[in-house]
UniProtKB/Swiss-Prot annotation:
GO terms for cellular component: extracellular region. This is Guanylate cyclase activator 2B. The keyword ATP-binding does not apply. It comes from Cavia porcellus (Guinea pig). Disulfide bonds join C67-C80, C100-C108, C103-C111. The keyword Methyltransferase does not apply.
Length: 111
């Protein structure tokens, strides 16, 4: 009887571990030498919708305003150092989330 209980606990533990591993898989987007997570692109869109930077800062700085947001995901920060940051971030924003989550878009990996 003790071995059945142990076997039952191990089975439950295995199922829990599988569910946790499945939840940690992420879809990555590779674009112009940068690799970012789809979740980061979703957060980028949300940050841009909520943040309005000062017009003076926009006039002085060639970087997109969102690059100065303290909550910008770490994997997007290297893009902000590029001279093409605005166009790269724009391209990432326009990638359809559904296409990446379904792995239709060739730039998306990790499905």
């Amino acid at each position: 009887m003790g071995s059945r209980t142990l076997l039952g606990h191990l089975s439950v533990l295995a199922v829990v571990l599988l569910l946790l591993l499945q939840g940690t898989q992420s879809v990555d987007i590779k674009y112009q030498g940068y690799q970012v997570q789809l979740e980061s692109v979703k957060k980028l869109k949300a940050l841009e919708e909520q943040w309005v930077s000062s017009p003076r800062l926009q006039a002085q700085d060639p970087q997109p305003a969102v690059c100065h947001h303290p909550a910008l995901p770490l994997d997007l920060q290297p893009i902000c150092t590029s001279q093409e940051a605005a166009s790269i971030l724009q391209a990432l924003r326009t990638m359809d989330n559904d296409e990446c989550e379904l792995c239709v878009n060739i730039a998306c990996t990790g499905c």
